[in-house]
Curated annotation (Swiss-Prot):
Catalytic reaction list: a lipid A disaccharide + ATP = a lipid IVA + ADP + H(+)
GO annotation terms (biological process): lipid A biosynthetic process; lipopolysaccharide core region biosynthetic process
Record GO terms (molecular function): ATP binding; tetraacyldisaccharide 4'-kinase activity
Pathway: Glycolipid biosynthesis; lipid IV(A) biosynthesis; lipid IV(A) from (3R)-3-hydroxytetradecanoyl-[acyl-carrier-protein] and UDP-N-acetyl-alpha-D-glucosamine: step 6/6
UniProt-listed Enzyme Commission number(s): 2.7.1.130
Organism: Vibrio cholerae serotype O1 (strain ATCC 39541 / Classical Ogawa 395 / O395)
Stored HAMAP family: LpxK (MF_00409)
Gene: lpxK
Protein name from the UniProt record: Tetraacyldisaccharide 4'-kinase
Domain of life according to the entry: Bacteria
One cellular-component annotation, GO: plasma membrane
Family per similarity comment: Belongs to the LpxK family.
Length: 335
């Protein structure tokens, strides 16, 4: 319901306006005061001894940050740099912090997004609610540039480049601050970032257009790859910020969909729940982010759909040029 109020002007939103508006004003005052305290030095912030690139957004919910992080890490690796990734590990609880992710780390300990990033890139990934501690853990792993997954509003960590990801379809909803609207910060905050990446929809003049390019479906048990259109009677599920985006992608791939089930972002799943869901079709298909949480109890007819961020070559070059410019003062040449 909150999504409908934020993005679709549901009538209930007008009824709740008098109740929620004061809290949005308070949220804005606290947010601005907190940021100013970091900017003036009244609150301490950590300056890492190597470049920090933040990938985040100004709205609550999923905007496509993780594919951008994966693309950025792979791009840095291809340039010869040694990137490490910092994440808060939303929705997870590790035995201790900081946690450096490895092949055996369960998603329940590190979070679905850090696990996905590690599996896709093999770059060092450190999880800690205090991101400066995660950075310090990565320094022991020979990295020479830090990429933070989310954290645009985590001003306790100083940064060299800011990349904001925007949902090109939903944009900023009613353009109100939480809880009346989806905004973590005012839209004007985007005037200060280095790059605005627009996921889907139509990018504006100062934005970089991104599309998510799907590949073949991958079997969770065997790793077999298969065109989505060849899988019969698919039951689709998605525990992401905008499930309908995933379902629309499947339709564009001519998927034989018999049922679509959306879940909350970062939803925890169990075998019984998904076995029951899978009975509604011949195959169960999910996002790659969901797959990292379901691999331990996956069945032979469960699949996931990987997607990769794609940009126009000139847009990629703009980002690469900025990274190289920022790396120089740190004396962090590529390996």
């Amino acid at each position: 319901m909150i999504e409908k109020i934020w993005f679709h002007r549901h009538p209930l939103g007008y009824l709740l306006w008098p109740l929620l508006w004061p809290f949005s004003v308070l949220f804005g005052v606290i947010s601005r005061s907190r940021r100013k305290a970091y900017q003036t030095g009244d609150k301490p912030s950590y300056r890492a001894p190597l470049p920090v690139v933040v990938v985040g957004n100004i709205t609550a919910g999923g905007n496509g940050k993780t594919p951008v992080v994966v693309w950025l890490v792979e791009t840095l690796q291809n340039l010869g740099y040694r990137p490490g990734v910092v994440s808060r590990g939303y929705g997870a609880k590790a035995p201790s912090y900081p946690l450096v992710v490895n092949e055996q780390t369960p998603a329940q300990h590190c979070g679905d997004e850090p696990k996905l990033i590690f599996q896709r890139t093999k770059a060092p990934v450190a999880v800690d609610p205090v991101r400066s501690q995660a950075v310090k853990a990565l320094l022991e792993h020979g990295v020479n540039v830090i990429v933070t997954d989310d954290g645009l509003q985590h001003y306790a960590l100083q940064r060299d480049i800011e990349i904001a990801v925007v949902d090109g379809v939903r944009r900023f909803g009613n353009q109100e601050l939480i809880p009346l609207g989806p905004l973590r910060e005012p839209v004007s905050r985007l005037d200060e970032v280095d790059f605005i990446i627009t996921n889907g929809g139509v990018a504006k003049a100062n934005e970089i257009a991104m599309r998510l390019q799907p590949t073949d479906a991958v079997n969770l048990k065997t790793g077999e790859r298969c065109a989505v259109s060849k899988l019969t009677r698919l039951c689709a599920m998605a525990g992401i910020g905008h499930p309908s985006r995933f379902f629309n992608t499947l339709r564009e791939l001519n998927a034989d969909l018999v049922h679509c089930q959306g879940f909350a972002d970062h939803q925890a799943f169990d075998a019984a729940q998904l076995n029951q869901l899978a009975q509604q079709g011949d195959h169960l298909i999910m996002t790659e982010k969901d797959a990292v949480k379901c691999a331990e109890f996956a069945q032979p007819n469960w699949w996931y759909l990987p997607v990769s961020a794609q940009f126009a070559p000139e847009a990629e070059q703009r980002i690469v040029d900025k990274i190289k410019e920022v790396m120089e003062p740190y004396g962090s040449p590529s390996a």
